[in-house]
Amino acid sequence: MEVKNIGIPHVLPPASVCDDPLCPWHGHLKVRLKLLEVTVEKVRMHKAAVVIHEWLHYIRKYNRYERRRKRMRVRVPECIEVKPGDKVIIAETRPLSKTIAWVVIGKKEDVVEWKAKHETLQA
Protein backbone atom coordinates (compact mmCIF):
# COMPACT_ATOMS: atom_id res chain seq x y z
CA MET A 1 0.00 0.00 0.00
CA GLU A 2 1.25 3.47 -0.87
CA VAL A 3 2.13 6.01 1.83
CA LYS A 4 0.44 9.39 1.43
CA ASN A 5 2.13 12.74 1.88
CA ILE A 6 0.24 14.35 4.78
CA GLY A 7 1.86 17.75 4.26
CA ILE A 8 4.05 17.78 7.38
CA PRO A 9 7.69 17.59 6.23
CA HIS A 10 9.44 16.81 9.54
CA VAL A 11 7.55 13.64 10.50
CA LEU A 12 8.62 10.37 8.89
CA PRO A 13 5.93 7.83 7.87
CA PRO A 14 5.69 4.61 9.91
CA ALA A 15 7.58 1.52 8.77
CA SER A 16 4.57 -0.80 8.98
CA VAL A 17 1.55 -0.67 6.69
CA CYS A 18 -2.11 -0.75 7.73
CA ASP A 19 -5.50 -0.80 6.01
CA ASP A 20 -7.17 1.53 8.52
CA PRO A 21 -9.42 4.05 6.69
CA LEU A 22 -8.86 6.59 9.51
CA CYS A 23 -5.07 6.54 9.19
CA PRO A 24 -3.49 9.78 7.91
CA TRP A 25 -0.66 7.82 6.20
CA HIS A 26 -2.55 4.91 4.57
CA GLY A 27 -6.21 5.95 4.74
CA HIS A 28 -8.22 8.98 3.71
CA LEU A 29 -8.05 11.04 6.94
CA LYS A 30 -6.88 14.62 6.38
CA VAL A 31 -4.94 16.44 9.10
CA ARG A 32 -4.84 20.13 9.92
CA LEU A 33 -1.66 22.04 10.73
CA LYS A 34 -2.04 22.16 14.53
CA LEU A 35 0.64 19.86 15.96
CA LEU A 36 1.33 19.01 19.61
CA GLU A 37 4.00 16.99 21.37
CA VAL A 38 2.30 14.97 24.11
CA THR A 39 2.89 12.01 26.44
CA VAL A 40 0.79 8.86 26.23
CA GLU A 41 -0.96 8.10 29.53
CA LYS A 42 -3.32 5.17 28.78
CA VAL A 43 -3.83 2.81 25.83
CA ARG A 44 -6.90 0.89 27.01
CA MET A 45 -9.40 1.85 24.31
CA HIS A 46 -9.58 0.14 20.92
CA LYS A 47 -7.59 2.24 18.37
CA ALA A 48 -7.48 5.19 20.78
CA ALA A 49 -5.40 6.50 23.68
CA VAL A 50 -5.42 9.14 26.39
CA VAL A 51 -2.55 11.62 26.22
CA ILE A 52 -1.41 14.49 28.44
CA HIS A 53 -0.45 17.87 27.01
CA GLU A 54 1.64 19.99 29.43
CA TRP A 55 2.67 23.62 28.97
CA LEU A 56 3.74 26.68 30.96
CA HIS A 57 1.37 29.64 31.38
CA TYR A 58 2.74 33.06 32.36
CA ILE A 59 1.05 34.90 35.28
CA ARG A 60 1.82 38.58 34.77
CA LYS A 61 0.82 39.67 38.28
CA TYR A 62 3.44 37.46 39.93
CA ASN A 63 6.02 37.41 37.11
CA ARG A 64 6.01 33.63 37.30
CA TYR A 65 4.96 30.65 35.24
CA GLU A 66 2.50 27.98 36.28
CA ARG A 67 2.39 24.48 34.90
CA ARG A 68 -0.83 23.50 33.14
CA ARG A 69 -1.94 20.17 31.75
CA LYS A 70 -4.80 18.80 29.70
CA ARG A 71 -5.92 15.23 29.05
CA MET A 72 -7.01 14.50 25.50
CA ARG A 73 -8.29 11.43 23.69
CA VAL A 74 -6.57 10.69 20.37
CA ARG A 75 -6.95 8.19 17.55
CA VAL A 76 -4.06 5.71 17.19
CA PRO A 77 -3.72 4.14 13.70
CA GLU A 78 -2.89 0.44 13.47
CA CYS A 79 0.51 1.14 11.88
CA ILE A 80 1.79 3.13 14.91
CA GLU A 81 2.56 1.21 18.10
CA VAL A 82 2.39 3.30 21.29
CA LYS A 83 2.63 2.43 24.97
CA PRO A 84 2.22 4.52 28.14
CA GLY A 85 5.09 6.97 28.62
CA ASP A 86 5.87 7.41 24.91
CA LYS A 87 6.33 10.92 23.51
CA VAL A 88 4.22 11.26 20.35
CA ILE A 89 3.28 13.94 17.84
CA ILE A 90 -0.45 14.46 17.31
CA ALA A 91 -2.25 16.49 14.64
CA GLU A 92 -5.70 18.01 14.65
CA THR A 93 -8.33 16.47 12.38
CA ARG A 94 -12.08 16.56 11.93
CA PRO A 95 -14.14 15.23 14.87
CA LEU A 96 -13.97 11.42 14.71
CA SER A 97 -16.26 10.88 17.71
CA LYS A 98 -17.72 12.86 20.59
CA THR A 99 -14.32 13.25 22.31
CA ILE A 100 -11.72 12.44 19.62
CA ALA A 101 -10.53 15.14 17.20
CA TRP A 102 -6.76 14.44 17.17
CA VAL A 103 -4.73 11.64 15.57
CA VAL A 104 -1.23 10.29 16.31
CA ILE A 105 1.03 10.86 13.30
CA GLY A 106 4.29 9.54 14.75
CA LYS A 107 6.57 9.08 17.71
CA LYS A 108 9.01 11.75 18.82
CA GLU A 109 11.90 9.55 17.58
CA ASP A 110 10.44 9.67 14.04
CA VAL A 111 10.76 13.46 13.77
CA VAL A 112 13.59 14.78 11.60
CA GLU A 113 14.94 18.15 12.68
CA TRP A 114 14.75 20.67 9.86
CA LYS A 115 18.22 22.17 10.48
CA ALA A 116 19.93 18.77 10.48
CA LYS A 117 18.12 17.77 7.29
CA HIS A 118 18.91 21.14 5.66
CA GLU A 119 22.63 20.92 6.58
CA THR A 120 22.95 17.42 5.10
CA LEU A 121 21.44 18.62 1.83
CA GLN A 122 24.04 21.40 1.49
CA ALA A 123 27.03 19.27 2.51
UniProtKB/Swiss-Prot annotation:
One of its GO terms (biological process) is translation. Keywords: Ribonucleoprotein, Ribosomal protein, RNA-binding, rRNA-binding. GO terms for molecular function: rRNA binding; structural constituent of ribosome. Pfam families: Ribosomal_S17 (PF00366). GO terms for cellular component: cytosolic small ribosomal subunit. Gene3D superfamilies: 2.40.50.1000. One of the primary rRNA binding proteins, it binds specifically to the 5'-end of 16S ribosomal RNA. Part of the 30S ribosomal subunit. PANTHER family: 40S RIBOSOMAL PROTEIN S11 FAMILY MEMBER, 40S RIBOSOMAL PROTEIN S11-RELATED. Belongs to the universal ribosomal protein uS17 family. This is Small ribosomal subunit protein uS17. The lineage of its organism: Archaea, Thermoproteota, Thermoprotei, Thermoproteales, Thermoproteaceae.
